[in-house]
From Swiss-Prot:
<dbReference type="GO" id="GO:0030145">
    <property type="term" value="F:manganese ion binding"/>
</dbReference>
<keyword id="KW-0413">Isomerase</keyword>
<keyword id="KW-0464">Manganese</keyword>
<dbReference type="InterPro" id="IPR013022">
    <property type="entry name" value="Xyl_isomerase-like_TIM-brl"/>
</dbReference>
<feature type="binding site">
    <location>
        <position position="183"/>
    </location>
    <ligand>
        <name>Mn(2+)</name>
    </ligand>
</feature>
<comment type="subunit">
    <text>Homotetramer.</text>
</comment>
<protein>
    <recommendedName>
        <fullName>D-psicose 3-epimerase</fullName>
        <ecNumber>5.1.3.30</ecNumber>
    </recommendedName>
</protein>
<feature type="binding site">
    <location>
        <position position="150"/>
    </location>
    <ligand>
        <name>Mn(2+)</name>
    </ligand>
</feature>
<feature type="binding site">
    <location>
        <position position="244"/>
    </location>
    <ligand>
        <name>Mn(2+)</name>
    </ligand>
</feature>
<dbReference type="GO" id="GO:0016857">
    <property type="term" value="F:racemase and epimerase activity, acting on carbohydrates and derivatives"/>
</dbReference>
<feature type="binding site">
    <location>
        <position position="215"/>
    </location>
    <ligand>
        <name>substrate</name>
    </ligand>
</feature>
<dbReference type="InterPro" id="IPR036237">
    <property type="entry name" value="Xyl_isomerase-like_sf"/>
</dbReference>
<keyword id="KW-0479">Metal-binding</keyword>
<keyword id="KW-0170">Cobalt</keyword>
<feature type="binding site">
    <location>
        <position position="156"/>
    </location>
    <ligand>
        <name>substrate</name>
    </ligand>
</feature>
<feature type="binding site">
    <location>
        <position position="6"/>
    </location>
    <ligand>
        <name>substrate</name>
    </ligand>
</feature>
<dbReference type="Pfam" id="PF01261">
    <property type="entry name" value="AP_endonuc_2"/>
</dbReference>
Amino acid sequence: MKHGIYYAYWEQEWEADYKYYIEKVAKLGFDILEIAASPLPFYSDIQINELKACAHGNGITLTVGHGPSAEQNLSSPDPDIRKNAKAFYTDLLKRLYKLDVHLIGGALYSYWPIDYTKTIDKKGDWERSVESVREVAKVAEACGVDFCLEVLNRFENYLINTAQEGVDFVKQVDHNNVKVMLDTFHMNIEEDSIGGAIRTAGSYLGHLHTGECNRKVPGRGRIPWVEIGEALADIGYNGSVVMEPFVRMGGTVGSNIKVWRDISNGADEKMLDREAQAALDFSRYVLECHKHS
C-alpha cells in the first residue's frame, strides 16, 4: 500500500502552496499528498510543471480530491449544467495528465455539499449520473486517470451512501477506470460492518480515505482498524490509503466540513506534524500486518 494525507489537515482553505506540503509530507515519511482540484483549472502550464517537478523531486505521488460545485453536477436534470460539468472534467483531466496525476476521487457523480432544501430525485439523478460518468470516464481513461466515486454519508449526499450502492453504480457505468472510493468516516455512519463494506467493494475498491469518527487522525478514536486491516488483506488491496483528518475550525474548510470546535486541542503546526507522523506509523502497521502470504 501507499500511504498519504490530505493537505487540508493543515489548511483552512481549499487551496494552498502545494509545493510546501509536498516537501513537508516527504519529510514526514508519506508516499502521497492529496490535493484539491478546485485551483487547478487556474494553473498555468508553468505552474503545473513546477508542481509536478516538486512532487517527482521529493518522491511524492499526487492524488486529487474534488467536491464538485452545483455547476459541475453530472447528475443534474438541467442538460446545460451536465454539459458544463462534462466540459469541466474534460479540462481538469487533461490538466491531471500534464501533472502526472493518476487518481481523482470524491463525489464526482454529483455535487457537494448537497442543498437539501431542493427536491431529491434519486432515481433520475442516478440514471443521469451513470450516463454522464460513463462519458467522462472515456476522457479519464485517455488521460490515464482512475475516476474514484466516493461513498458518502446521508448528510452529505443521497446517491451513493453504502459500498453496495457504490458497486452497483460502478457496475452500471461499466468502465475499468471508474472505481469505488470508501472512507472510514462515512462508513462509520452508514455501514452495518466496516469490514463487510470493504469486502463488498472488493476488486472495485480504487481508493481509501481514513480518519476517526470525529475526523481526528487514525489511531486517536474508536474506528475498528484491525477489522479494516483484515478486510483489506482479504480483498488483496494494495492501493492508496490517504488519511483525511479535519481538526481545525475556521475558513472555508472548517465551514464546509462543519468543524465547530478545536479538535486539535490548540495544536500548532509542529504538533500537527507529529500527530500525522504517528498516525502514519500506526496506519502502516495496523493496515498492513494482516497481509496474506
